[in-house]
């Protein structure tokens, strides 16, 4: 656990040898629930624990889903992202039925929205039509300032708090804490 310069925010950074964890998890009888067991009691110290997962449904993501209470699903405003979303929602159902009955979907967040393109509008319309209130009201625009922030080791809201992307993520955070 590493403290940050931001009050009440600590991080557990990923490491290059995290790939070896996949092999280790496969060897363990409790491999699918290892992270859940490791995080038991974390709520006593932290109000929120966020697990940033790779965009695949491998063992690390399954472990995170088994440990989570809720899952926030980011979806890029692009055609193929819709296909991946269907697959992910099915995986969430599978994890819920086999490993974690308390798992729920906090919402679907539309990201990389380009207001100049018809595609972004079409994807947003389809998501809202099919998923309704599950889709966050706020969307995150495609933004150079968002893309720059990691290179400075900063969250977007610290890199440029007035940027459209930082403001969008602030709205998402407020909406997330309001949702059950």
Which residue ranges define each predicted feature?
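P-loop/Walker-type NTP enzyme "switch/lid" segment
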Residues: 1-44, 99, 103, 125, ...
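Short, conserved glycine- and acidic-residue-centered signature motifs
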Residues: 28, 81-84, 165
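C-terminal alpha-helix
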Residues: 171-180
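Conserved catalytic-core segment of NTP-binding enzymes
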Residues: 40-144
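C-terminal boundary of histidine-terminating zinc-finger modules
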Residues: 150-171
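Active-site donor-binding loop signature of nucleotide-sugar glycosyltransferases
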Residues: 14, 138, 142, 161
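Charged catalytic carboxylate motif
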Residues: 34, 87, 168
């Amino acid at each position: 656990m590493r403290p940050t310069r931001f009050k009440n925010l600590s991080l557990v950074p990923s490491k290059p040898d995290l790939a070896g964890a996949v092999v280790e998890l496969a060897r363990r009888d409790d491999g699918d629930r290892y992270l859940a067991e490791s995080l038991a009691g974390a709520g006593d110290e932290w109000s929120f624990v966020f697990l940033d997962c790779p965009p695949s449904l491998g063992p690390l993501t399954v472990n995170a889903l088994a440990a989570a209470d809720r899952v926030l699903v980011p979806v890029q405003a692009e055609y193929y992202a819709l296909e991946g979303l269907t697959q992910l929602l099915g995986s969430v159902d599978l994890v819920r039925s086999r490993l974690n009955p308390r798992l729920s979907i906090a919402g679907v967040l539309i990201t990389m929205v380009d207001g100049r393109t018809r595609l972004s509008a079409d994807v947003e319309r389809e998501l809202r039509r099919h998923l309704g209130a599950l889709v966050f009201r706020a969307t995150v625009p495609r933004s150079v300032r968002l893309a720059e922030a990691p290179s400075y080791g900063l969250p977007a809201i610290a890199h440029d708090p007035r940027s459209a992307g930082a403001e969008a993520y602030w709205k998402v955070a407020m909406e997330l804490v309001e949702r059950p």
